Amino acid sequence: MIKGISETLGMPIDNWGETQSDRDYNAYNFSYKSVFGLEDERLPQFVKLETALGSYSFPTRKLEIGNYIGDYLEEVGRTDLVETFGLFKFLMKVQALERTYIDKVFALCDYYIQGKSKRYSRHLYDIYKLSPMMKLDEAFSELIKETRAHRAKMTICPSAQDGVNVPDVIKEFCDKEFYKEDYHAITNYFSADVVAYEEVINNMRKIAESGVFDSFQSIGNGKSR
């Protein structure tokens, strides 16, 4: 099915040989040629489609989805064009920001454990921007536990496994400046609202010291540590 979509779009999957149907996780790179003739390793010439078995969104909320073009056309009274091109707002079930935030913290830990930094420092920026929206209460702590248990079922999520101290992993990649080079090369290049590396790292240290990620998975004998 995915290959058929690629052919219909005229966007060859340039890493097709690296994917396998029996994997929990796959990433398909739908390649394209920039109309501007832009060639920069910081902006890969492909759209990445990621698939993961056993991963599902929770909790979810219904939000109104719109787009800039549709909003503009409504503002200038061209609802005829909005209707012609199907640009009206609609409701969509989306994953709660709290879950996205938690996933990003675990993802940074996963990539550090796996020794992968390239193009992943963007999570530092996202977490920084989302942090003021988070309420670190009991419900949030419970969602962390549920998310960790869910991620622990997937082999690509090592930081969710039993015995891994997430706050320690966060402090370690902060101390070693693991994401610093990538952050300066990628995140600052694309973002119009630049946030200094030191600020996003200080934010991660606060998360590590907050205590909300201190919970551990239960281990064999039913105890937790």
Task: Name each model feature, range by range.
Residues 1-225:
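Structured mid-to-C-terminal alpha-helical surface segments
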